[in-house]
Amino acid sequence: MGSIAILGVPGAESGGGTLKVYNWGEYIDEDVITQFEDETGISVVYDVFETNEEMYPVVEAGGVKYDVVCPSDYMIQRMIDNNMLAELDYDNIPNAKQIGDDYWNMSKDFDPKNQYAVPYCWGTVGILYNKQMLEQLGVPKPTSWANLWDPKLSDEILMQNSIRDAFMIALKQKGYSLNTSNPEELAEARDMLIQQKPLVQAYVIDQVRDKMINGEAAEGVIYSGEMLYIQEQIEELGLDYDLEYVVPEEGTTLWIDCWVVPKNAENKEAAEKWINFLCRPDIAKKNFDYITYSTPNTGAYELSDEELQNNEALFPDMDSPAMKNSEILRYLGDDTDNIYNEMWKEVKAQ
């Protein structure tokens, strides 16, 4: 668990009590927390986590009773299934109307009646490629995940060190659902990942961005929200190559992180004020500028400049074939999780 930061204003507690927030690291502009405290008189206790898997048992155990938490799609589904979340009162969250219909519909995949979760950030997984390096290697611009099996890319590929992301790539290439629990389809995907392994320079997470900026690889699997930072760095450093992002035609993982209120929250009223505050367009825009992951907030989108609005990595055409073929990650249950884990070990052991 991340260290607790109590960001309060003197005497604030008497105004509205304390709000315990559990969020991803680097996933909010800290000025927003201060502004919330100043405007509401509520004192914020703010903890951070690194993965959904780290967050879940902490909330489940209830040692710290968090009032508001920001999990991802599949983990929200798991929390709903296990009766861990409180239904939201949207009368207290009028700014929820700023969230676009596309994102409410995406959320229905794991929260069918939109009762428990308010979208915060979203994005895709795709291929980041160095245009000039691909030309030198004689590799075409990627339009399919199959590109990551091109023998000319030996030692030039950075893969995500993430079980579901890695399997998604192999499964989608074969035309299977990224949420399959079919052992035969999973075995096929495992074998493909083993076959690809000699081409892979490294399995990494956060390092894809910096390695690609440094020209250390020709292609990398990356999250769409990294593109704004990458484009700024290319300009700032005056690099003489282009890094471009594409979602392959077979589709990809659509992910969405949302705010939820655990059932054992001690200050649900403050939690709903927090969610409402973060849905305010000026605040959502401030967070978007800081986090750089796509915002589902239509008001914040309208406040953004035209260049950002037209950035296809951040705001893709939802009617394109690639996006229509994309899926939200689902929680598949412990048994299927174990199959994925065992098969991933087999890939890494080769």
Could you describe each region identified by the protein language model?
Residues Y56-P57, Q77-W122, L137-A146:
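Hinge/lid segment of periplasmic solute-binding proteins
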Residues L158-S162, A166, A170, S177-V246:
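Ligand-binding pocket segment of bilobal, Venus flytrap-like solute-binding proteins
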Residues L128-M133, K172-G175, W255-N267, K286-N287:
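A bilobed periplasmic-binding-protein/Venus flytrap-type ligand-binding module shared by bacterial periplasmic
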Residues A86-K97, A117, L237-T253, P262-A265:
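Short beta-strand->loop
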Residues I6, G11-M79:
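Early extracytoplasmic/lumenal segment of secretory-pathway proteins
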Residues A146-N161:
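Short loop->beta-strand "edge-of-pocket" segments that line small-molecule binding or catalytic clefts
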Residues D210, S320-Q350:
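Conserved C-terminal helix/tail region of periplasmic/extracytoplasmic solute-binding proteins
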Residues P262-M323:
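Mature extracytoplasmic/periplasmic domains
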